[in-house]
Amino acid sequence: MNANGGHDIQLVIITGMSGAGKTVAIQSFEDLGFFCVDNLPPSLLPKFLELMKESSSKMSKVALVMDLRGREFFDSLIEALDEIGETSWITPRILFLDAKDSVLVSRYKETRRSHPLATTGLPLEGIQTERELLEELKGRSQIIYDTSDMKPKDLREKIVQHFAADHGHTFTVNVMSFGFKYGLPIDADLVFDVRFLPNPYYIDSMRPLTGKDQEVSSYVMKWNETQKFLEKLTELLSFMLPSYKREGKSQLVIAIGCTGGQHRSVTLAEYLADYFKKDYYTHVTHRDIEKKSRK
């Protein structure tokens, strides 16, 4: 029970770019036992939550998909979020799904569907319009997933790992390795560049391996600069993480980048996740590990 006599509700609002994976997301929340509503008009959101508060069903987990169909729809959503924000009995979390424009265009071509905001029928026009309209909403979002390199199962796994009630944590440290050659991860809160470390790519026996292999991991970790860097980085993060948690942040995405996302970044991401798991719920992902390594 909360201070107002109602029951506590975990509310997740799923929004973001059309084609970024909202259908997969809502299905994943259903699998987690959330009460799910697809395309609830924003103007009805405050009333919907009041009804849930007064309901005898005591649903404690709710996920709502809210799509952008036009500027009027967007304005209503912002107003609804402001109204909810003035209440003290519920704090919604916004999950924003994003992807690169080129990926979204490709997905629309594969499905042969029209973008809802494309007046000329060209997907890119609608995508650019939608991205501009959603800029403020993205800025309000507590959780941002870049699904550009995700298969549906990857997105489903990420949601389950983040929102599954059985892990009993309200703050998650997500450590991600990536390759700079494939672009920066747009959902990262902190990015660290480890391209200054000796690169096992140039050793023939290690080139086809990854940082999850012992031979590569031992090579990366044996250098003095690696040990010094990790000493300073863990000290910095140990200072920062409690403050992020205190501010109410539900997750922190720490991205470690090397050239191709195969060797150095993978080794260090694995190390950091293991280092902090004693104090935080941690999850490690390797964004580019399955991509073919090439120079």
From Swiss-Prot:
Record carries keyword ATP-binding: yes
Pfam families, A to Z: PapZ_C, RapZ-like_N
GO molecular function: ATP binding; GTP binding
InterPro entries: P-loop_NTPase, RapZ-like, RapZ-like_N, RapZ_C
Residues noted as binding ATP in the record, renumbered to the chain: G16, M17, S18, G19, A20, G21, K22, T23
Ligand binding (GTP): D67, L68, R69, G70
Keywords, sorted A to Z: ATP-binding, GTP-binding, Nucleotide-binding
Keyword ATP-binding: yes
Family: Belongs to the RapZ-like family.
NCBIfam families: PRK05416.1
Purpose of the protein: Displays ATPase and GTPase activities.
Protein name in the entry: Nucleotide-binding protein BLi03725/BL03417
Organism for this UniProt entry: Bacillus licheniformis (strain ATCC 14580 / DSM 13 / JCM 2505 / CCUG 7422 / NBRC 12200 / NCIMB 9375 / NCTC 10341 / NRRL NRS-1264 / Gibson 46)
Lineage: Bacteria, Bacillati, Bacillota, Bacilli, Bacillales
